[in-house]
């Protein structure tokens, strides 16, 4: 029995991927960039429909997570649980953006003009805050995630993120 031919490659996606791989500066090499972007692109498709937006988002996540010393897949799991990838999400307590950053942080660091619905800005804040809590918790991820969410002492949120992380690894 003959195996079916692979689906034809979408030329638009090929062009976008090539462009984003060439711009991906947080990867060790182009092969790693291409492999990771392709793998994550397929998983992110249900949340972000436009291929260019998906790849741009993934590059930003990889860059900010790597800069903060985090695994990009963990950051994707946090985003899935926090906002379902909605950059305009606002929680009942006022947290904003994909990583649901509390706006008081802007004034705390003297940057009240920062826009937390800007993906790069939100990722930068969120990744640094998450990394800080991981360090404070001596690497205990469940505790760090509970601190990040403001639910320290309860691990329901942490369990949700860990479950989501399984899907991104």
Residue ranges with predicted function:
Residues 1-33:
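N-terminal, intrinsically disordered low-complexity tails/presequences enriched in Lys/Ser/Pro
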Residues 20-169:
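Catalytic glycan-binding domains that act on GlcNAc-containing polysaccharides
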């Amino acid at each position: 029995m003959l195996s079916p031919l692979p689906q034809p490659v979408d030329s638009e996606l090929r062009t976008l991927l090539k462009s984003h791989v060439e711009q991906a500066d947080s990867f060790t090499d182009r092969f790693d960039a291409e492999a990771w972007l392709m793998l994550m692109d397929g998983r992110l498709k249900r949340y972000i429909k436009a291929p260019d937006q998906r790849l741009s988002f993934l590059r930003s996540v990889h860059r900010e997570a790597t800069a903060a010393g985090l695994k990009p897949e963990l950051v994707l799991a946090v985003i899935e649980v926090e906002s379902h990838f909605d950059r305009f999400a606002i929680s009942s307590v006022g947290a904003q953006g994909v990583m649901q950053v509390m706006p008081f942080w802007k004034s705390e660091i003297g940057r009240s003009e920062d826009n937390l619905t800007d993906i790069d800005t939100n990722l930068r804040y969120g990744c640094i805050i998450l990394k800080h809590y991981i360090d404070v918790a001596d690497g205990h991820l469940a505790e760090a995630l509970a601190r990040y969410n403001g639910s320290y002492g309860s691990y329901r949120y942490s369990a949700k993120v860990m479950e989501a992380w399984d899907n991104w690894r």
